[in-house]
Amino acid sequence: MPVSRLKLTFWSVVILCSGLAVAGRPDGGYHLLKKYDLDAAPGGKEYWDYITFDASSRRLYISHNTEVKVVNADTGAVVGSVPDLKRVHGIVVMDDLGRGFISDGGADEVVVFDLKTLKPTGHIKTGGNPDCIIYDPASKHIFTMNGKSNDASVIDPAALTVLATIPIGGRPEYAVPDGHGTIYDNVEDKNEVVAIDSMRNTVKSHWPIAPAEEATAIDLDAQHHRLFIGGRNKLLAIMNVDSGKVVQTFPIGAGVDTNIFEASTGMLFVATREGTLHVYHEISPDNFSVVEAVKTEFGARNMALDPKSHQLFLDTADFAPAAEPSTEQPHPQPTPVSGTFRLLVYGR
């Protein structure tokens, strides 16, 4: 449903821990709470991808071109970084092992680092361009979805070895485990979701996601067996994983990259590059309602959730206008401005 714009009864702006604290909205909707500057990327080229929130340390691990920035989630302070990478995508944090795992797509490897010192301690070769990286609690293995070689690498996080390579049959994107031995993965160029048996390391099902296309973002309501699939054709599809059927769809903004379902509240969040945060609520497994569409900032397509505070973390930067079209670049895009990378905190 459309959301009316209500005038704020007051604005107060204060500098707090180097972040911008913003007055709350009287209508109780999601709004910007704080904004933190995160410094320029090494080498000056701004690029970012996944954000990982670690509840035990209350740290954010933020991919930032050739480094992972580590940020205090409560203060916005940068506490360190994992440097000297090629092109970072995702981060898995395993507190029980004291290790973190980074998918470095530019090096075709996973970089292992110490959670205390943030120093790299190992390198594991994977398939080409490992993008999404997840931990599967059923198998206790790490999986990387490799966008160039169209397969998944299965890693033992204790032994730091590759156990298997799973052919996907297309370009794998974001994936999510159900905790019981199945991983659901978007296959972007095939317009389908595959179900991976994480105990046998095989693909067991292929499901079309129509009318959604070019899916990137994905998350799961594990209790009710519903997948939330974000398509780059500006469509959110909700799928029953027992049948592989799409049961509901919603229009969304351009450039979706993250879906998050919060099981404790039944809230579903969808972040898009155009600068819209879509918020939905689960009435029943086959009936989601639109709560609101929140204007964020252009480029804020990646997101993490703090389940304690229910706050959302997004990141973006300023953008320079796109260049004029040319033969080499017929569809130029706006480019991020070096030194403007920042963290946005949203909540109610």
Residues of each region from the PLM?
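Bacterial N-terminal signal peptides that target proteins for export
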Residues: 1-11
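Bacterial N-terminal signal peptides
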Residues: 9-19
